[in-house]
């Protein structure tokens, strides 16, 4: 299977998000890369489902709470930007203050 660098990145984010979900199920708090991956995966999958950009920007800020991440992680993440493929093309989605 030959994958482009972008496809490899998408798979890596998806896999990291799966690990993050499993850790949350076990009650383990997420670190920085896991939190970013989970939010990014939410946006990418939402775009694939055809949800509008504005909806994903708002909903992306409710994927993870402060209680679900390690101390200091929420303060480290101000914005998450994800290039996602929508039915009408690729768009950059920015989730502001994603961990509240």
Swiss-Prot record:
**What InterPro entries does UniProt report for this protein, alphabetically?**
Urease_gamma, Urease_gamma/gamma-beta_su, Urease_gamma_sf, Urease_subunit
Q: Which GO terms of the cellular component aspect does the record hold?
A: cytoplasm
Q: Which GO terms describe its biological process?
A: urea catabolic process
**NCBIfam families in the record:** PRK13241.1, urease_gam
Q: How does it assemble?
A: Heterotrimer of UreA (gamma), UreB (beta) and UreC (alpha) subunits. Three heterotrimers associate to form the active enzyme.
User: Which pathway, metabolic or otherwise, does it act in?
Assistant: Nitrogen metabolism; urea degradation; CO(2) and NH(3) from urea (urease route): step 1/1
- Catalytic activity field: urea + 2 H2O + H(+) = hydrogencarbonate + 2 NH4(+)
Q: Which GO terms describe its molecular function?
A: nickel cation binding; urease activity
The entry's family comment says: Belongs to the urease gamma subunit family.
Hydrolase in keyword set: yes
- Which Pfam families does the record associate with it? Urease_gamma
Q: Please give the Gene3D superfamilies that the UniProt record associates with this protein.
A: Urease, gamma-like subunit
Chief location: cytoplasm
| Entry EC no(s) | 3.5.1.5
Question: What is this enzyme's class at the first EC digit?
Answer: hydrolase
Q: What is this protein called?
A: Urease subunit gamma
Which HAMAP family is this protein grouped with? Urease_gamma
Keyword annotations of the record: Cytoplasm, Hydrolase
**UniProt keyword DNA repair present:** no
Compartments where found:
Cytoplasm
Which CDD domains is this protein grouped with?
A: Urease_gamma
What is the taxonomic lineage of the source species? Bacteria, Pseudomonadati, Pseudomonadota, Alphaproteobacteria, Hyphomicrobiales
């Amino acid at each position: 299977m030959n994958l482009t660098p972008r496809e490899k990145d998408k798979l890596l984010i998806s896999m990291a998000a799966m690990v993050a979900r499993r850790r949350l199920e076990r009650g383990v708090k997420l670190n920085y890369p896991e939190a970013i991956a989970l939010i990014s995966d939410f946006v990418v999958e939402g775009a694939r489902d055809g949800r509008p950009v504005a909806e994903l920007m708002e909903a992306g800020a409710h994927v993870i709470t402060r209680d679900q991440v390690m101390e200091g992680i929420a303060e480290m993440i101000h914005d998450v930007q994800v290039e996602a493929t929508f039915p009408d093309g690729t768009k950059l989605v920015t989730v502001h203050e994603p961990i509240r």
